[in-house]
Structure formats: C-alpha cells, structure tokens
Amino acid sequence: MPELIINGPEGRRIEARYHHEAKSDSPIALVLHPHPQFGGTMNNQVVYALYHTFAARGFSVLRFNFRGVGRSQGIWDGGPGELADAASALDWLQIVKPDAKCCWIAGVSFGTWIAMQLLMRRPEIDGFICVAPPSNLYDFSFLAPCPSSGLMINGDNDRVVPSSCVADLSAKLKTQRGIKIDHEVVSGANHFFENKIDDLTNVVGSYLDMRIAKDADEREQRRAREKEREAARERERQRENEEVVAPVADTDDD
C-alpha cells in the first residue's frame, strides 16, 4: 500500500493511505484514528480493521495521520486543527471520487469526537461508525440533532470509556426523529479491542451489509417513484396536446 501525501490546512502535508475502487460511483469512507498524544495513529489495529472492512464492501477508503503524527506536518491542536485535517481529507476523497453514491465516516475513541463534529458540518455524510466514543471525556452535546443514522460500538471491559457512557450517548441520540442509532457491545473487549478485532469487524461488517442493502432498496424505491412521476407528467402532457389539436365543432349555419 503506497504512501500518500495530501494537502492539508494551510498547505501542511497529511500522510495517508488510500484504497481505490475502480467503479466511478463507489461509496467512500473516511477513518479517523485515536488520540495522537496517547499513541494513536492511522496504523492503529482498530483503524486498520475498519479500513479493510469498508474496502471489502466496495468502498474507496482513506485513513490518515492527524497533524504531528508520523509524516503529517504540524503540532497537536487539541481538536480544532484535527477537525480541519479531517475536513481536508474528506475534501480530497470527494475530489477523487466525485460521483460516489454515498459517504461514510468512522472514528476510534478520540477520532469519534472529531468524526461526529465533521458529520455535523457535512450534510453529505450518510452514515457513521463510532468505536468506543469517549463521551465521558469529551462533550458530544453538539449532536443536537444527530443528522445521520449510524452504529456505536464498545467493549464491556473498557476501562477508559465505560459501557454505560456509550449507552447513555446512544440513548440520547435515539430521541431524534428519523434517526436510528444502533448500539452494540462486544463481550470481553477492552478499549483497544485486544484479541477481539474479529468480533469487532463482524459487528461492523454486519451493520454495513444491512445499511448497504437498505440504502440500495431505498434508492430503487426513489427511482421507481420518480419513474412513476415522470410517467404521470408525460400522460398529462399528452392529454394537453390532445386538447389543443382536437377539431373545433363547425358552427356555420347552412
């Protein structure tokens, strides 16, 4: 997998890895890594697993290092700068795949906090995956309302982010009309999902399969409705044309 350098905010370099799908309308996904000051990088095993879970389902996928990590330029900014990095990465991904049929974002721990802020700013994001969202450490109240449906997943042996905190966050978001938040707990998993990566990818993969099938069905229904509307418009045009060309009754008296 070749190294990729993309342009970030203020001309800074961002180190990334990219999986490209040849189909012009392939869906896209952006994956954000855990806290840089606690060893988080784009090569984190959970980030890597999410990246390949998306790729296995036909997504074009991008993961990258936040500023100051690896070969990405800059220094840790506590959130605003990292959000700008993520926005630049999504911009790049959308330039490469302008015809993508849908857009997803995923994050791990600190990366979920950045991912969800980006979700609020980018209405084109259709779904999300949040792994161990640290709602006990960061304020997620900006998700009011949450604009997209998605999955939150954590381990029940997580000593960094208690499962109850993720459950509370998920429950709050479920109150939004038209938004469905799924919450899954992986038994025995800690914050880093050590020895539980397969369980994690099985849950995420099943969720993506469900959403992909559902979204495809909804797109087909929309196409069918639009086809019917166009047929109705065509019938109306034909009726109007027939009225215009209909012969006028002869009113001359012989």
Regions found by a protein language model. Give the residues of each.
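Catalytic histidine-centered segment of alpha/beta-hydrolase-like enzymes
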Residues: 74, 189-201
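Short beta-strand/loop motif that positions the catalytic acidic residue
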Residues: 146-154, 158
